[in-house]
From Swiss-Prot:
S-adenosyl-L-methionine binds at residues 202-203, 236, 259-261, 338. GO terms for molecular function: 4 iron, 4 sulfur cluster binding; metal ion binding; rRNA (adenine(2503)-C2-)-methyltransferase activity; rRNA binding; tRNA (adenine(37)-C2)-methyltransferase activity; tRNA binding. The keyword Methyltransferase applies. It is found in: Cytoplasm. This is Probable dual-specificity RNA methyltransferase RlmN. Gene3D superfamilies: Aldolase class I.
Length: 389
């Protein structure tokens, strides 16, 4: 059972999405648009069987389709060799409509970082970033077109929010990346996609239902999912407290990442506008509750900005606030600020970054300076702007 904190509002996200005044924050600039075509992963098991029946296909064909998609990353009718030849194209069109189309692919870090710009069915643009490390391969995926959080140092935040992405649009990013790894399209040869981070475009808690459905299917074993362990999936948030509480209740052992960026309300109000709705205490209370329930250490994301939030007093206050809840429940990831066009914010001096880390370490806080992968292709944290080049 989670601890109740009197300052934390109990209202917010409901099974149907968001409610009340909270909705306008997550849906700022949201335009009503047509929905993406219904994809296999958007359907319930019953809907899949019904769709198959409409095509004159028996129930067992649904499992074959699932195996093609999750087990072999196939959506091409030519690969459905276990299907009647006359039904292959019809089944592919009905269950696997094309939801994302590659526009550009940019490569950095000697071919181990790949940023892909995708066009969705309505012309919207989103990006994903695939990063190969010596011991793992991580895909950073988007969950919304744009973002309504309006953080001034983030390129995505400057776009505003266009719409939520469907489960299918989210999962297709994963399928394509998994296929790229299997087929050896990433420097280093054939491999396996091992980690997923919801740290691309958008606020995942603002598209909770689609994100959760994606998490469940990404982590389920084939033929129900891709078989990527939930422990290797990270769901990030700027501090949408109702979403954190809802995720806590799910009992899925994903890692929670909180984009804190400041240790005080005065400073965080400026850097993360959502703080005016859910303040630092409420966010940290909810994050600590997540740790209590899951025993998964929470990641605290902290973009270091020169002369803004990178001084000794900031590190000391951050350590004090985290230690208030006890030991070893959170891991801090200071992130050297990645440059974005027209921004007044700049990266911290290297010596200030190291001092910040040392202060946290002396206070008993585990902290690791984040790698800035993909910076030269605008693929690093805070740089995703979905621009055609």
């Amino acid at each position: 059972m989670t601890t109740q904190h009197p300052d934390t509002p109990e209202t917010g996200i409901t099974p149907g999405g968001t409610s009340g005044a909270f909705r306008d924050v997550l849906s700022k600039d949201h335009a009503r648009r047509g929905k993406p075509p219904l994809h296999f992963v958007d359907m319930t098991p019953e809907q899949r069987v019904e769709k198959a029946a409409e095509l004159g296909l028996p129930k067992f064909r649904v499992k074959q389709l699932a195996n093609h998609y999750f087990g072999h990353f196939d959506v091409n009718a030519a690969e459905f060799t276990d299907f009647p030849a006359a039904k292959r194209s019809e089944a592919a069109a009905a269950f696997f409509p094309q939801l994302i189309t590659e526009v550009t692919r940019q490569v950095a870090d000697e071919g181990t970082t790949i940023k892909t710009l995708w066009k969705l069915f309505d012309g919207s643009l989103i990006e994903s970033v695939l990063m190969r490390y010596p011991t793992r391969t991580t895909l950073c995926i988007s969950s919304q077109v744009g973002c309504g959080m309006d953080c001034p140092f983030c390129a995505t935040g400057k776009l505003g929010l266009t719409r939520n992405m469907s489960t299918g649009e989210i999962i297709e990013q994963v399928r394509v990346a998994a296929k790229m790894m299997r087929d050896g399209e990433v420097a280093g040869g054939e491999g396996r996609l091992s980690n997923i981070v919801f740290m691309g475009m958008g606020e995942p808690m603002g598209n909770y239902n689609s994100v959760l459905s994606a998490v469940r299917q990404i982590s389920a074993m084939p033929p129900e999912g891709f078989g990527i362990s939930a422990r290797n999936i990270t769901v990030s948030t700027v501090g949408v407290v109702p979403g954190i509480k809802k995720l806590t209740a799910e009992g899925i052992p994903v890692r929670l990442a909180v984009s804190l960026h400041a240790p005080s309300d005065e400073l965080r109000d400026e850097l993360v506008p959502m703080n005016k709705r859910f303040n630092t205490k409420q966010v940290l209370d909810a994050a600590h509750d997540y740790w209590l329930a899951s025993k998964r250490r929470v990641s605290i994301e902290y973009a270091l900005m020169r002369g803004i939030n990178d001084q000794a007093e900031h590190a000391q206050l951050l350590a004090k606030r985290l230690n208030h809840y006890g030991d070893n429940w959170a891991h801090v990831n200071p992130i050297p600020l990645n440059p974005i066009e027209g921004s007044k914010w700049t990266a911290s001096k290297p010596e200030d970054e190291q001092r910040f880390l040392e202060i946290l370490h002396r206070a008993g806080i585990t902290a690791t300076l984040r790698d800035t992968r993909g910076q030269d292709i605008d693929g690093a944290c805070g740089q995703l702007a979905a621009k055609e080049r």
